[in-house]
A protein has these predicted regions:
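Internal catalytic domains of large membrane-associated glycosyltransferases
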Residues: 5-169
Length: 169
């Protein structure tokens, strides 16, 4: 049965992509009124969930996004949360140093918080739940990234939530 489901999913997706005037609106009608140039006015948390990953690449991936958000003049509306479940003491020490230096470098432009849990309770979902309990009420929106994610500032700024406040509700 999974092969049949996969086939029809691909077939319907192909037909929508091929024949719909706007494929995104065809599958998400709420996107119809979104221009993509809406002014950013809401507080957004960007969550970077990590576990036992060397921080060099993550810092390299974050830097262009941070620079783009600061250059757009909206850095004060974003807060980066590095949510670590790292169990390896050596990697944890490196995370603390690298993300501490990153936070110091961007101190006056974009807030960066590094938090490490000693216990990996609930795995990644538990990591995000812990964020929601501690800081969730401080933000209107959240974008979740994995350790290997790369997202440009333009992609973050094109997010759809400001355009249609009920999308995702």
């Amino acid at each position: 049965p999974w092969i049949v489901v996969g086939f029809w999913n691909a077939a319907i997706g192909f037909l929508i992509m091929r024949f719909a005037a706007d494929p995104v609106v065809a599958v998400l009608p709420a996107a119809a009124g979104i221009r993509g140039d809406e002014v950013v006015t809401a507080s957004t948390a960007i969550l970077l969930c990590i576990r036992n990953e060397l921080p060099d690449r993550m810092v390299r991936n974050l830097e262009p996004m941070l620079a783009g958000l600061a250059a757009a003049g909206v850095g004060n509306l974003f807060h980066i949360y590095v949510l670590s479940d790292t169990g390896d003491a050596g990697i944890a020490a490196e995370e603390t140093a690298r993300f501490g230096a990153l936070a110091a470098r961007w101190r006056d432009r974009i807030e960066i918080t590094y938090r490490r849990r000693d216990l990996n309770t609930g795995y990644k979902a538990g990591n995000i739940r812990d964020f929601c309990q501690r800081w969730g009420d401080d933000h209107d929106f959240a974008v979740t990234l994995d350790a290997d994610s790369f997202m440009t500032a333009d992609a973050v700024l094109r997010r759809r939530s400001n355009g249609r406040l009920l999308v995702g509700a």
